[in-house]
Amino acid sequence: MDKNKAVINFLLSCDYVRNSPLFYTLGQVEADNKQVVTLANDVSVNTPYIDGSVKKRYTFTLIDYQTVTPNAVITREVDNTNVPVSENLDNAFKVQQVADWVTEQSDLRRYPDFGSDCVIDDMVVVTDQPNLNGVDRAVTPVLAKYSISIRIDYIDYSKAIWK
């Protein structure tokens, strides 16, 4: 199984991702577009076992473009409580929801399908909140580039001498 396609299929099962354009490696920089970029896999993690199987790591980043405004955070009273209101806070929260969804899937042991020769041990979001990688003021509307990185550790049994 192609691991890149498996990750795309997995992400498309998340409502927030499925309802927006998703690109692989290269995409259009527009509000609400998402992009999957694979990272160089850490070969130092490759641990061969006596049966021929190998522990490996697959890491990717999900980039999410969201609109941003220079407006200050304001508060509104809701049910006798002051609640912060900000488009920027709301948009960052959208990206956080994907990170939370991935963590929830991992807790339930629902992983991308890497095929019958691979068994996923763990899937983690590398940071506890999205990274803000920059703001593009050259476009209208102004866009923020948020990202979350996800690491998948798995055992590759494709060369194992017994299974």
Residue spans for each PLM region:
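Short secondary-structure junction/hinge motifs that connect adjacent elements
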Residues: F23-K34
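Charged, often glycine-rich, active-site loop that binds/positions anionic groups
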Residues: D32-D42
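Charged, amphipathic alpha-helical segments and their flanking helix caps
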Residues: M1-T25, S44-K163
